Amino acid sequence: MITISNATEDDIPDLVKLLNILFRQEKEFDENPELERKGLSAIISDPKTGVIIVAKENQKIVGMVNLLFTQSTALGSRVGIVEDMIVSITSRAKGVGSKLMTRAMKLAKENHCARITLLVDRDNLQAQHFY
């Protein structure tokens, strides 16, 4: 059974592993576990910045997505940015990504976001097809 929750500091080592899978696919990023840990910790420790949502199967993290908050000058209100969506290879095609996105959209609404912007790399055709 897949459960969806907000990430905690204890989840960071597993999140770094997932990010490294993602960054191997994205040409513009290099793996840097130290910086990844720092960024993850900054988001997790400050709910005003955003939230990292995780999917767990049998208590093991199998997916994640970041929902970051910022202010839109065009809309004059808070907006959400969704990025770093990754599901482990063995957990794909099981609805994990859909559950993560559903939670991200729900949290964006609960946090009064006027819109959500999704970031996906131009050459990540698999992700574009999913969305």
Question: Which residues are covered by each model-predicted region?
Answer:
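Conserved active-site alpha-helix within GNAT-family acetyltransferase domains
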Residues: S98, E110, R122-Y131
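Hydrophobic adenine-recognition pocket in adenosine-nucleotide-binding enzymes
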Residues: A7, M85-V87, V120
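Short coil/turn motifs at secondary-structure junctions
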Residues: T70-S72, T90, D123-L125
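Conserved acetyl-CoA-binding loop-helix of GNAT-fold acetyltransferases
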Residues: V87, A93-K106
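Acetyl-CoA-dependent GNAT
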Residues: N6-I12, K17-S77, E83, T102, ...
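Conserved GNAT acetyl-CoA-binding A-motif
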Residues: M101, A108-L119
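Extreme N-terminal starter segment of soluble prokaryotic enzymes
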Residues: I2-T3
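Conserved catalytic-core motifs of GNAT/GCN5-like acyltransferases
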Residues: F69, T117-D121, Q128
